[in-house]
Amino acid sequence: MATENGPDKSVYETLSLIFNFPDDTQRLWWHSTAPMLAEMLQTCEYSVHNQYQQLGIFKKHIIPYLGVYPTKSKERWLSILTRYGIPFELSLNCSDSVVRYTYEPINEATGTEKDPYNTLAILDSAQELIRIQAGIDLEWFTYFKDELTVNMTESEYLRSNGLVNCQIKTQNKLALDLKGDQFTLKVYMYPELKSVATGKSLHELIFGSVRRLSLKYNSIRAPLDMLDDYVTSRNMGANGEEHLPLEPRLLSCDLMDPHKSRVKIYLHERKVSLSAMEDLWTLGGRRTDSTTMDGLNMVRELWDLLEIPTCLQKYPAPFLELGQIPREQLPSMANYTLHHGDPMPEPQVYFTVFGMNDSKVISALTEFFKRRVWNGMARKYRAFLQNSYPNDDHESLNYLHTYISFSYRKNKPYLSVYLHTFESGSWPIFPDSSTAFKTYRRCDLSCKDNGLDDKLLSPVCQLRV
């Protein structure tokens, strides 16, 4: 809404004028990521009050745990959360218009002798969130952290013996689902280093930890047994490229009352194909009910719309450099939710679209939204991304979308997108701010008024590829 003094400032712009930051690192994190978060909240029609609330929580309680602001010249902790090692990622539940973000908590001790493998920062971050959100329960967090991440003795053993080279160093991360002015919290655990330290396989660590938990919470035992049987039978039948083993990769759970919390086990599938996705969806033919088949038809529909190349992939290593244009394809993935009292694990499959043309991905998603009569999302989705990255050539970008997840329960489809979240909005804000992702920057754009002091702006046309 415009006034006689000009257009109203956005929530992000207003907060940017009000907020003080303790250092340049937090200021840069805010201006690099908050524009896209604000745009997503607005797209999903969060009330103005809730937009202010959620952006305030992000600034005060999340940004201080993102660590060194990533640049090409600074040494930093590399997070498995993104291919660029950036420890923050926005995602959007398109079916319910729910905003979500995930981050790997990082502090000053991360990567030092005090905490070489970032075991401890998450403890402080979780405690800070408990103080502002009712209903967070750490029982399962504490249990799985002990089971799946290294303790100080194991950390010293790994460090002193030089056993950590190219393994995933990330051990844990947190995710917030934003519900009005509240949020729910989830934790993810990667036991790669625990496997090295203990000599136990990832399968033994992940499935074993859940099996021991089921001694107390027997209501998750049946779906665990079903999933374990599927993975074991798949792996026993592995015989080369046609039938590849499934590799457990990580585990997540809701940080709430354990009787309401869900455990999710994530499996890594190297074969990228529709047949592999069908096998993941049906647990090798174990799920054959009508709901499963209805969901499978939509999986096939998405596969056809997205046109993902069929291939055999390992997870690439090492990380991509900031600003590097991906020339790669990621392997597939699925997670399985173990619901209390439900004997059948619930699948969620991931379409790996990182490295594919983002404009084509948007077109495919928009068509899927239209077919589901998600008219608001169909109308707004492309504009949301264009507004989040207004200075980029969106016909050329191929790194905004990382994954598209799909599940189907109670006769309803659920689709989420996982998005590159860095240097969004009218970046660069400050004349001396570096820009890593500039290959597809458009140099024909003049600076737009972003509500900040004009002296802080740097014209986009000054960027050089």
UniProtKB/Swiss-Prot annotation:
Keywords attached to this entry: Alkaloid metabolism, Transferase
Binding positions (L-tryptophan): I80, L81, E89, Y190, R249
Gene Ontology MF terms in the entry: tryptophan dimethylallyltransferase activity
InterPro entries in alphabetical order: Aro_prenylTrfase, Aro_prenylTrfase_DMATS, DMATS-type_fun, Trp_dimethylallylTrfase
The protein's Enzyme Commission number: 2.5.1.34
Catalytic activity line of the entry: L-tryptophan + dimethylallyl diphosphate = 4-(3-methylbut-2-enyl)-L-tryptophan + diphosphate
Annotated Pfam families: Trp_DMAT
Keyword flag Repressor: no
Entry keyword annotation includes Transferase: yes
BP term (GO), one: ergot alkaloid biosynthetic process
Residues at which substrate binds: R100, K186, Y188, R262, K264, Y266, Q348, Y350, Y414, Y418
Pathway: Alkaloid biosynthesis; ergot alkaloid biosynthesis
Function: Catalyzes the first step of ergot alkaloid biosynthesis. Ergot alkaloids, which are produced by endophyte fungi, can enhance plant host fitness, but also cause livestock toxicosis to host plants.
Subunit (UniProt): Homodimer.
Family annotation (PANTHER family): INDOLE PRENYLTRANSFERASE TDIB-RELATED, PRENYLTRANSFERASE ASQH2-RELATED
Similarity section: Belongs to the tryptophan dimethylallyltransferase family.
Record's protein name: Tryptophan dimethylallyltransferase
